């Protein structure tokens, strides 16, 4: 997507403090954190929200969910963490590219 800031981060057109990346997803620090540690995990492929996910996204979404605890632990969130997916304007979503918030206080 041409105007999607998260697509631009995934394509390395905009810098971000990346903490994890593979061929399908990238995780970076939120520039406006709501917790001492606030990360965003995004798929490199664009779809607006969880409500826009298609059956072919199921393997990717599963991989992302399983990657969350690994990223949290590697980032120092060893005493627990919170995950959040805002979906749609009414659900508080501000950037319309699916993303998983990973938040907590590093130990």
UniProtKB/Swiss-Prot annotation:
Disulfide bonds: none annotated. GO terms for molecular function: catalytic activity. Residues 5-107 form the HIT domain. This is Protein HitA. InterPro entries: Histidine_triad_CS, Histidine_triad_HIT, HIT-like, HIT-like_sf. It holds the Pfam family DcpS_C. PROSITE patterns: HIT_1 (PS00892), HIT_2 (PS51084). Gene3D superfamilies: HIT-like. It comes from the Bacteria. A motif (Histidine triad motif) lies at residues 97-101.
């Amino acid at each position: 997507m041409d105007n999607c800031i998260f697509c631009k981060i995934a394509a390395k057109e905009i810098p971000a403090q990346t903490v994890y990346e593979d061929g399908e997803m990238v995780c970076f620090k939120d520039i406006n954190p709501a917790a001492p540690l606030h990360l965003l995990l995004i798929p490199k492929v664009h779809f607006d929200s969880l409500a826009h996910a298609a059956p072919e996204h199921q393997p990717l979404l599963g991989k992302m969910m399983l990657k969350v605890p690994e990223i949290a632990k590697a980032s120092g969130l060893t005493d627990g963490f919170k995950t959040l997916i805002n979906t749609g304007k009414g659900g508080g979503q501000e950037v319309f590219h699916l993303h998983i918030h990973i938040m907590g206080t590093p130990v």
